[in-house]
């Protein structure tokens, strides 16, 4: 009889432990908000551009940005997010959101550029990204790498 009561008591305690372990103070029914962000390149004129980005949903803890990079120099399909995220992680500059920068140097007229940004979660993993391709204003081929004005 004592053995039977002991088994019943142990089974009851086991069930209570299972119930307690499955309940937590976190509300699992709360919707998880996936972080999203945007990136916009505007005011493209006379070798300048305005690059802006902001968090739209969710929470992030830091970001990296590539303000402009020639599309012709990218050796992969930037539409594949995993490759783009890795590229920004390796080549980007740490920034905070919201982000705004007026680019006034380094653009070549007529060149297609990509601007890209990624944001990180609390564990340091990239959780969202955004990019935009755009063409620098001006006349293509007007840039000279040499010290001369070219053939006039």
Please give the residue ranges for each predicted region.
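Recognizes extended acidic, P/S/T-rich segments that occur
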Residues: 64-108, 122
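Sec-dependent bacterial lipoprotein signal peptides
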Residues: 1-21
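Acidic, Ser/Thr
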Residues: 54-58
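Beta-strand-rich modules
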Residues: 104-128
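Bacterial Sec-dependent N-terminal signal peptides
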Residues: 17-46, 134-151
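Generic structural signal for coil/turn-prone sequence and helix-edge features
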Residues: 130-132
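Structural beta-strand segments of beta-rich domains
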Residues: 47-51
């Amino acid at each position: 009889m004592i053995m039977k009561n002991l088994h019943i008591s142990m089974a009851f305690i086991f069930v209570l432990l299972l119930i307690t372990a499955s309940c937590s103070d976190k509300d699992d029914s709360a919707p998880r908000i996936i972080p999203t962000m945007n990136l916009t390149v505007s005011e493209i004129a006379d070798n300048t551009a305005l690059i802006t980005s902001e968090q739209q949903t969710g929470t992030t803890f830091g970001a990296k940005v590539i303000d402009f990079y020639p599309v012709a120099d990218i050796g992969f399909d930037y539409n594949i997010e995993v490759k783009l995220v890795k590229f920004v992680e390796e080549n980007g500059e740490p920034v905070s959101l919201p982000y705004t920068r007026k680019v006034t140097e380094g653009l070549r007229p007529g060149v297609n550029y990509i601007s890209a940004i990624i944001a990180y979660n609390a564990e340091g993993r990239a959780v969202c990204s955004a990019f935009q391709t755009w063409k620098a204003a001006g006349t293509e081929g007007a840039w000279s790498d040499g010290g001369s004005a070219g053939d006039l």
